[in-house]
Every structure is written in structure tokens, then in C-alpha cells.
């Protein structure tokens, strides 16, 4: 049963209540290994569903366009200060609705339409908003893209440097959605300084690892840092932009009134709660456990003959190239889902297949680490993944059904925030 209980939803709209309950049960029974997902705490859930959703608060604390802000202002001020303290930055804006609007606000702060911007190619591991052609950022601006080395699968910093010198972009983005290795922020900072670019570190995927000391911080190297507040940070669906003091005013004006109206106050409160949780010692333990689990899982998959992009991982994310297995990422992901293991199909660098039917799988360990799984469980997880993929190639539903039952049996012993099993 969903926790907290939802009796009022059940009374008003049983159809939606049933779907919420079904989703809660699904999340409880699955090895949720999509790298961009996690579980939030009950405290974050409660803040997200509070009466703060009733309030409108255009502007910033002390400078609002609506009355009745005497409790909203301190909530946002607390959230901002906690972000500043946790990440060690000069300034933080907690109002962006999500990661894409946060990145768009950065463009608004520093670029004009037609300006050159630089980011990692999406098929190589970047993000849509770093200038990819189907995104508004690739239509309004002139994107140039860097990638990874064919021989190592790692970021090609020589290419980054050469492109930056040649193209002189206004912004250089570092970070992405499928980068399994540590990002070299000092090297990016050196390139940005040489070419006069604003360096933006998009740490949406690794923010929790940075906060917990399990990944190097971009603070002191990047001019601006954007991040979602979910993923490894275990907060609500929101975002933050952090910056040096020099850029604080430009960022704030870009978010409001440049891009958004009123912030979502219930989300701001939930961000504040999540940031307090992330400052606790047990969160640091959690962040390091994510990396330990990823490395253990990567080693177990490698032992079973799987090819990992870059040869392994330094963070929460593993990218498998299934080309040697002669199965596409989409059918593999669907088979795994039926077996109780939730991942997403993903392009791999230099993929010869189409994006909607790529060669890879993207796997993350954030959620299963929140549930309490450790390194000792990773060989079994790898075995289930391997068996499921092999069964998919043989259309062996019996094997997949057996594994789904074993996954449910394992997870019954690991509590999930937001769900209470029925006796």
C-alpha cells in the first residue's frame, strides 16, 4: 500500500488511486536500475504533497509580486542556504522546474540566438539541452559537439580543446546522461579559460555523489553548475542552478522573469528537506555505496562477457554495449523488465543502430542502493541480467518468469520508502 495512505484520492477518484497503488507495488517489486531514477524519503514525499502547492510566489524572497509570503520566503531562503552550504558555492537558485529549464536559463543568461555553444554529442553520452539538433538549444544556437575516443570510450579532451580553440563558444557544457567515468573539471576549466567560454557543469546525474564526496566537485572550476534535484540527490522532481557570485544576478534574472513565472513552492520545500538529508553523515555513506555497487556490478558483468563502454565505471552508471550478444538494447530492456529488472535501452558511442533501437543498455545503482543492496548482491543481479538477456534471444519465457519471482523474493526483505506491503 502507498505510504502515506491516499484515502482521499481513493474516495474522489478510485481509478487514479488504483493506478497509484499499482505503481507503488511495481516500484517495490522491481530492481529499479534506470540511472536517472531513485526513491525519495517519506519526508520529501510529505513536503511535495503539502498545502504549499496552493501558493503563488512570483519573485524572490523579500521581492515578491504577491502577498502572503511570510512562510514561503523562509522556506526558499532555507533551501538556498542549504544548497550553498552543501556544495560550497557562492550562490544558488532553487526555482527551476526541472533540468531542461535550468539549462535553458543558462543560455538565456549568457547567450543570444545564433551564438556558438559546445557540448557533448547526445549519442556519445551528452544531453538534449547541450545543443542537440532536435532540442530548442540546437535550433536557437549554433552547436558544436565533442565525443569520446574510439579506443577507450572516454572523453576526448584533445578534441574538446581543439574545437574550443577553433569555434570559440560562448558556453562549454560538461556532463551528460551516459558518462560512466569521472569528469575532469580542472581540464575543462583550463580549456574554457583559454578560449573565453563560460564553463557550465551539468551534474544532474552525479549531484548526490558530489554532495557525498564520491565524485570530484566542479566548484572552483565551473562558472555555473546546473543539476536536477532527483537522481542521485534523492530529492523531488526539480532543479537548481549554482554559480559564482559574479554570475548570480544574471542567473536569477534568467530564471525569473526571463523564463519562468512563480516557483513551485511545494517542490522548494521538498528540495530543502532533501538537502538537509544530503548533509547528514549517512548520505555520505550512501553515495560511496552507490559507487561500490556500480563497480561490483561492472566487474560481475565483465566476468560474464559483457562489453562495458570505457571498460567500467567510476560513478552510479554502467553502459553496456550488447553488440557481441547479437541482441538490440530495446528487446533486451523489455526482457529485463519482464524479469523484474528495470533499465533503459541507450545508444552507445559510435552506435550503428538507430536511437529508438540502439545497441546499448544504461544501468544505474542509485535506487537499489537506497533499498539497501550492497556489493554482495551484485553478482546475483549480474547473473539475473545475463540469464534474462540469454532467455530473450531464445524466447524462453519460463526463465524470465522464474527470475521475476526470485527478484520479488529478494526485494521483499528491503523496505521501500513510500510503500508498505500488505500482511
Report the location of each language-model feature.
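Conserved PLP-enzyme active-site core in the AAT-like
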Residues: 74, 78, 82-305
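PLP-dependent enzyme catalytic core of the Aspartate aminotransferase-like
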Residues: 2-14, 81, 292-293, 353-423
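Flexible, glycine/charged-enriched surface loops at secondary-structure junctions
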Residues: 30, 61-62, 91, 262-265, ...
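Conserved PLP-binding catalytic core of the aspartate aminotransferase-like
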Residues: 307-372
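N-terminal glycine-rich, Lys/His-bearing helix-loop that initiates the first secondary-structure elements
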Residues: 1-78, 410-412, 417-423
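Short acidic (Asp/Glu) and glycine-rich catalytic loops that position anionic groups and cofactors
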Residues: 23-29, 54-61, 169, 248-253, ...
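A glycine-rich phosphate-binding loop feature that marks nucleotide/adenosyl-phosphate handling sites
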Residues: 272, 289-295, 311-321, 352-354, ...
Amino acid at each position: 500500500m502507498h505510504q502515506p495512505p491516499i484515502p482521499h484520492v481513493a474516495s474522489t477518484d478510485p481509478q487514479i488511486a488504483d493506478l497509484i497503488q499499482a505503481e507503488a507495488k511495481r516500484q517495490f517489486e522491481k530492481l529499479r536500475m534506470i540511472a536517472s531514477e531513485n526513491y525519495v524519503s517519506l519526508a520529501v514525499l510529505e513536503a511535495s504533497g503539502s498545502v504549499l502547492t496552493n501558493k503563488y510566489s512570483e519573485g524572490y524572497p523579500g521581492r515578491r509580486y504577491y502577498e502572503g509570503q511570510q512562510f514561503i520566503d523562509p522556506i526558499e531562503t532555507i533551501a538556498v542556504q542549504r544548497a550553498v552550504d552543501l556544495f560550497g558555492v557562492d550562490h544558488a537558485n532553487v526555482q527551476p522546474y526541472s533540468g531542461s529549464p535550468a539549462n535553458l536559463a543558462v543560455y538565456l543568461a549568457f547567450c543570444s540566438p545564433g551564438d556558438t555553444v559546445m557540448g557533448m554529442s547526445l549519442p556519445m553520452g551528452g544531453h538534449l539541452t547541450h545543443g542537440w539538433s532536435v532540442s530548442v538549444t540546437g535550433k536557437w544556437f549554433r552547436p558544436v559537439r565533442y565525443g569520446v575516443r574510439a579506443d577507450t570510450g572516454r572523453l576526448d579532451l584533445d578534441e574538446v580543446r581543439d574545437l574550443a580553440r577553433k569555434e570559440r563558444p560562448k558556453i562549454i557544457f560538461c556532463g551528460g546522461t551516459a558518462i560512466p567515468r569521472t569528469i575532469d573539471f580542472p581540464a575543462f576549466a583550463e580549456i574554457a579559460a583559454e578560449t573565453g567560454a563560460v564553463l557550465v557543469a551539468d551534474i544532474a546525474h552525479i549531484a548526490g555523489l558530489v554532495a557525498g564526496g564520491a565524485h570530484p566537485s566542479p566548484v572552483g572550476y565551473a562558472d555555473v553548475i546546473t543539476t536536477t534535484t532527483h537522481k542521485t540527490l534523492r530529492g523531488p522532481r526539480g532543479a537548481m542552478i549554482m554559480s559564482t557570485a559574479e554570475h548570480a544576478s544574471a542567473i536569477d534574472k534568467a530564471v525569473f522573469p526571463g523564463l519562468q513565472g512563480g516557483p513551485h513552492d511545494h517542490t522548494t520545500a521538498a528540495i530543502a528537506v532533501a538537502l538537509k538529508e544530503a548533509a547528514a553523515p549517512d548520505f555520505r555513506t550512501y553515495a560511496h555505496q552507490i559507487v561500490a555497487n556500480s563497480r561490483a556490478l561492472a566487474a560481475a558483468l565483465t566476468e560474464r562477457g559483457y562489453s562495458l563502454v570505457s571498460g567500467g565505471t567510476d560513478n552510479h552508471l554502467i553502459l553496456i554495449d550488447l553488440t557481441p550478444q547479437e541482441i538490440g538494447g530495446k528487446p533486451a530492456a523489455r526482457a529485463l523488465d519482464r524479469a523484474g529488472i528495470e533499465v533503459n535501452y541507450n545508444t552507445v558511442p559510435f552506435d550503428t543502430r538507430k536511437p529508438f533501437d540502439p545497441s546499448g543498455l544504461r544501468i544505474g545503482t542509485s535506487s537499489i542502493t537506497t533499498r539497501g543492496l550492497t556489493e554482495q548482491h551484485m553478482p546475483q543481479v549480474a547473473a539475473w541480467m545475463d540469464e534474462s538477456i540469454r532467455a530473450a534471444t531464445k524466447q524462453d519465457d519460463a526463465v524470465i518468469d522464474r527470475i521475476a519471482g526470485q527478484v520479488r523474493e529478494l526485494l521483499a526483505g528491503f523496505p521501500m520508502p513510500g510503500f508498505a506491503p500488505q500482511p
